[in-house]
């Protein structure tokens, strides 16, 4: 199995370098890659940067160059639910844009010609032995499933949070990359899963203590998934 990993931060890339055997640096047209092995699996890691365009470009280049069997994205997200707190981990089970509007005849957040929401079935996960189920079993009680909103906005305003929750009541978290990666994987017919650690409650600036440990927390989750899938 070949696993493509899109990481959010440079420190996360640095942590993964020490975990991958036979690692070597390679260069695409836009992005740099770390290529190696975890157990029997081939692994390709890329730091794509923040936002919808960066993440879509990163996913497209990775899929084109390396043809991974599935793509895993790690990073952080803000919580839209009162019972989902900083430091908790979620696995996305559907992905939807919150800042797209293509006309009244379409669902808010739907890109014309695309599904209104990208789900595991639509991006091919069920063809890979229920990948979401496998990852859920690996992380067990340490992970929650969630609907993910994405847009080019870092949400720290209570009014924006309330508007998002009112418009998309089933969504639990918001980030800036997951849905654009899901859309890219949908177009390329490559399975995709996003794992996100909750950074804040979307109502205030991120917690200082959280940012001291987030890379290590995210690395631990990614490492465990790769170990168990290997």
Regions found by a protein language model. Give the residues of each.
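Active-site-proximal beta-strand elements of phosphoester/diester hydrolases
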Residues: 44-48, 147-149, 195
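Proline-aspartate-enriched helix->loop->beta-strand connector
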Residues: 67-72
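Mid-sequence, gly/pro-rich, charge-dense loop/helix-turn segments that line enzyme active sites
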Residues: 80-168
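Short, acidic/turn-prone active-site loops that include or flank metal/cofactor-
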Residues: 29-31, 50, 94-97, 197-200
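N-terminal short beta-loop-beta anion/metal-coordinating cradle
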Residues: 1-66
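A C-terminal functional module that forms or caps the active site or interfaces directly
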Residues: 154-204
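Regulatory input/activation interfaces that engage signals or partners
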Residues: 192, 197-230
């Amino acid at each position: 199995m070949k696993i493509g990993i899109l990481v959010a931060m440079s420190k996360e890339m640095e942590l993964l370098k020490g975990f991958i055997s036979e690692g070597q640096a390679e260069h695409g047209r836009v992005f740099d890659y770390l290529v190696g092995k975890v157990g029997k699996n081939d692994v390709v890691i890329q730091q794509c940067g923040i936002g919808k365009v960066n993440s879509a470009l990163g996913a497209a280049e990775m899929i084109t160059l390396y043809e991974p069997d599935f793509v895993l994205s790690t990073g952080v997200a803000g919580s839209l639910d009162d019972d989902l707190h900083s430091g908790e981990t979620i696995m996305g089970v559907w992905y939807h844009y919150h800042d797209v509007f293509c006309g009244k005849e379409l669902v808010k957040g739907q890109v014309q010609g695309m599904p209104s929401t990208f789900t595991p079935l639509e991006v091919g996960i069920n063809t890979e032995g229920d990948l979401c189920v496998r990852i859920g079993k690996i992380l067990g009680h340490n992970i929650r499933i969630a609907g993910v909103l994405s847009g080019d906005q870092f949400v720290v305003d209570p009014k924006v949070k309330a508007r998002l929750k009112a418009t998309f009541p089933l969504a639990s978290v918001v980030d800036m990359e997951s849905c654009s990666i899901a859309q890219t994987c949908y177009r390329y017919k490559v399975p995709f899963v996003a794992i996100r650690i909750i950074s804040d409650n979307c109502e205030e600036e991120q917690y200082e203590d959280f940012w001291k440990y987030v890379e290590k927390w995210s690395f631990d989750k990614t490492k465990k998934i790769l170990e168990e899938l290997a």
